[in-house]
Amino acid sequence: MSHEWLISASETMRSIGNGEGLRDKGAVVANNDGEFNEGDTNREEDSSTIFSFDFDEEIVMCIDFSGGKLGCSILDYHTKTLKAFDQDYVVNKTTISSHDLIDDADMSSNDISLLLGLLIMEANPTVCLVPARLEDWIFDYIKTKCDEINCRLELQPIKRFKKWDLLQSLQLRGHDNQTILNDILSNSKFTTTVTLGTVGCILANHEQLGEYNDSTASSNMVTGRLVQNAFEDVIHGIRYIDIRDRMVLDENTISALHIFPTAHKLGHDKMMRNGFFSVFELFNQVSSDYARRILKSWLINPLTNKKRIETRYSIIRTLLDKQNAIIFSDLSQSIKRCPDAFGFINQLRSGKSTLGTWSKVASFLEKGIAIFQLVSSLKLGSDEANILHDIKNKVDISALKECLRKVETVIDFDTSRDTKTLTINTGVDNRLDECRNIYNHLEGILLDVARETQIFLLNTMPQEDCKTTKSLEKLVNAVYIPQLGYLVTISVLMEPLLDGIPNLQWEEIFRSSENIYFKNGRVLELDETYGDIYGAISDFEIEILFSLQEQILRRKTQLTAYNILLSELEILLSFAQVSAERNYAEPQLVEDECILEIINGRHALYETFLDNYIPNSTMIDGGLFSELSWCEQNKGRIIVVTGANASGKSVYLTQNGLIVYLAQIGCFVPAERARIGIADKILTRIRTQETVYKTQSSFLLDSQQMAKSLSLATEKSLILIDEYGKGTDILDGPSLFGSIMLNMSKSEKCPRIIACTHFHELFNENVLTENIKGIKHYCTDILISQKYNLLETAHVGEDHESEGITFLFKVKEGISKQSFGIYCAKVCGLSRDIVERAEELSRMINRGDDVVQQCGNLTEKEMREFQKNQEIVKKFLSWDLDLETTTTSENLRLKLKNFLR
């Protein structure tokens, strides 16, 4: 007998955590996605604009600048963390720079722009809130930065920045959280006035979103809680935004040092596959999005606190210890693809959990336990506490094991993966097991009902109707439909025959194009006996999962804290892995010395593209930072590098910058040895930031970068300058460069400077000579063959293009007064005629000839050509065209050809 199963056993063992499946069955699932009216990114509000807002993923940033004070706070909905300045950032012009090269008006704007750019880049907000009274130049800068990262900029009324009472009503768990909150509130009238206003604005903004979300009747099916104004649901912790112990990098430096990727790998050769275009790519061996966010934060914010930096060194040193080699390898494997605890906890809280969610919970717990055991096996030093000590001593491993035991006891992951639905283990709940047993035997029960119905119809229908009726097995069935219960189905072909049955007492429920669905006495008995078995199973499973979910959420603070530790450990494992693979060395940091000593340093990125990279050393010893008379003590803080084109000057420049940078993010460095005075800023004039929307000339953009670097630099800074002065007059460019070098060499608070230049005229007597105090001269070494004349630019034969000069890519002390630009142009394929003419002009200049006069003299070849052309002109002028009126055009053409012979 055939049965029409609308809901079969395989189809109904569904994932009750899946919202769509439950909606299909008539359940109501909370949808926390809301929409709200906010203004666009113009200075005028547009209340008709509607944006969606994800309460689990948004990052809201609020910035205010008032009375010379900058305040900032950030609410991360993903991690449920509120971050704020521990005190307002005060713009103090007297401490910005000791140099008199920049107007005071530009100092504060550069300082604020630099800080705002770093904050926005690090936070990567999705929404940025600013007050309507914000100064135009700050608003324009923030808008530009927000546009770059596709962040929505929203103007807020001033009254929202006075909602301090919202922060006072905030209740946070944990001693640290409450301490920070009380500290911010207690200093609200003194040091955190502007920052506290930004926090109030963020809370007021969330309050408005909650009210809108509540008005749309969005609810949470599992937790039964409305979003409303419950800040405790979105803020689980509060942290300081620390801007004091960080090295400052501006966007020019980040671009020049290739901190983040700006290009994609092209090609399939081994060199391209193994090479890295950015520091982020070099260390991006992490698997979770949250770990990637922390890595980005670390890269944007190198440290200046020696103790914190050396704590990271100690972890790398421990991981690379030969005694820990096997454990290090196992740790690197175990931590891969470790799920993000913030993600699955948000899904559990919002009622959006699926099989994937619970799989991540189990995977996180399994990997977390395995990593704890591996870390506990490491041979740790007795130095101060670090992440490894925190994992070993502060993580409650018994709680993790208990959570894992409960999850594995409740959920049958093997069956769930096979059926692609969430399945509860047998034995968890006797009531659920009993309902499942009934459900699994429904096919037999319904088969019996269908047979009984067929027999009933055969016995009650008139004899003549029975003869005309086809096989009842194909026309009569029994089915179960959730919520409707048990039904008898009859083919619509049999409807006329049913009219002949007296006192049938069947109730039609609904019909389709092929069947009619009835309730009769037999199926009513099933309704009474078994009820809505599918709904009962769903209810029991929801109840079980809700109980499990609550048990996991009670541990959310411990799980998220451990998640942060694991993410930071994964980054340090990446640092250690790169350091081991590429033979990096642990640098020595000093706090009070203006020193940059690098022995056999290498470029962290360029060496990934080369089989053999040629190392170079650097030595800057500028005495103590506090020494105002450093230049009188035979110390040097400035290096000027000269040399041939394409000889490696720019690479050497960025190589030193990257080594200092890597040292202060807490990683080992690509060098044999390094001793580095901690830098508070790395500032650059290397790459001209030209874009379509910037209409300034390249020299103007270069000068803006140079001015910004000089205005922000302190005695602890590092400035990298690559060929400043090009792109303008041949006198103005060298004059500006030389003036900057001389002025800085006399400054009491001169930063460390490494500069490259091709202005060889500066190294003549009484300008940038080797005798000037405070300046050291380096040059790139080259090997010149005997065929190459140092006094005259040699001609490179067509068959010997690669002969003459060999670039050694080695830096040594001294001054190079030749750039060999013509040779480089020849090797690069520039036209031979152009190169030969350039060589000729170069020889004239080197001999001291008058180039203008020489260019006015004609060669013998040119004189012969001139005389020939002169004869042609004379012949043409003596030609009497009046005599040619009857000459055909063809004959005229022939005569003209004769003139030109």
Swiss-Prot record:
Effect of residue 648 to R: Abolishes function; no effect on interaction with MSH4
GO molecular function: ATP binding; ATP-dependent DNA damage sensor activity; mismatched DNA binding
GO (cellular component) term, any one: DNA repair complex
InterPro entries reported for this sequence: DNA_mismatch_repair_Msh2, DNA_mismatch_repair_MutS_C, DNA_mismatch_repair_MutS_core, DNA_mismatch_repair_MutS_sf, MutS, P-loop_NTPase
SMART domains: MUTSac, MUTSd
Family: Belongs to the DNA mismatch repair MutS family.
PANTHER family assigned: DNA MISMATCH REPAIR PROTEIN MUTS FAMILY MEMBER (PTHR11361), MUTS PROTEIN HOMOLOG 5 (PTHR11361:SF20)
Protein name: MutS protein homolog 5
